Amino acid sequence: MFRDTEFPLSSGTFTMPQSESTPHNDDFDDVFGSEPGSPTLDGRDMRDGDMFGVGNTEISDIPRLKEKHETEGYRDGVTKGKSESVQKGFDEGYGLGAVLGLRIGKIIGILEGISGAVSVSASKSEGEEWTKEKSRVEELSNNAKNELKTEKVFAREWWGEDGIWKFEVPGEKEGKDVVFPDVAAAHPLLKKWEGIVEEEIQKWSLDMDLMEGNEEDVVLVGQHVKADAVEQRIGAAKTDLNW
């Protein structure tokens, strides 16, 4: 029989030879490369409508389209609202603006007329009285033009953002019907200058009925033509303005 022969082990550590690593060929990975793992049916994303249980990894266009539609809808609403509001505001403010414009034009027109007449008299007279009156009336006319500018008449001091006047109109607190001429007459600037103009009218003894053309039997000197006939001939028939 053979005996097991015990071979003495050397005192040194026995080291196994390491095998050299074989380089991996990647030349065909683009053709035979590994594919992603198969989807698993774990039921987590079935509520999202994915039959394989895998959520949609692409960003959905729904939020972007929703935001776009909301923005376009907002713009369309603002555009439509502006067109309706602007037209409505214009219709409501046109009447009052027209009355204010007529009264302001009358104030400036009378002062310019007085200034022109005084200037002619001052040029024909050598007295200092007419020269002083000329300077006074010219200054008065210039001040009226400055204070009755559009931006000052419609300043925030007199009007609110909604277009309602801030100044007191007679009869408004009592519940009486207030019309545009009442509002225009109560405007502080117009009230001031209409008072000044009235003083000038009294000072120079002006006939306002004659200046406003209310005489029915006005005859042109040398022509004997009535004013009504002239108006019809030039196509400017006089009409009453009811505000």
Swiss-Prot record:
Record's subcellular location: Cytoplasm; Nucleus
GO biological process, one term: protein maturation
Biased composition (Polar residues): 8-22
Record GO cellular component, one term: cytoplasm
InterPro entries tied to this protein: Essential_protein_Yae1_N, Yae1-like
Pfam families listed in its UniProt record: Yae1_N (PF09811)
Superkingdom of origin organism: Eukaryota
Region Disordered, annotated ranges: 1-49
Region (deca-GX3 motif): 73-113
Key words of the record: Cytoplasm, Nucleus
Known role: The complex LTO1:YAE1 may function as a target specific adapter that probably recruits apo-RPLI1 to the cytosolic iron-sulfur protein assembly (CIA) complex machinery. May be required for biogenesis of the large ribosomal subunit and initiation of translation.
Subunit text: May form a complex with LTO1.
Family: Belongs to the YAE1 family.
Protein name (Swiss-Prot/TrEMBL): Protein yae1
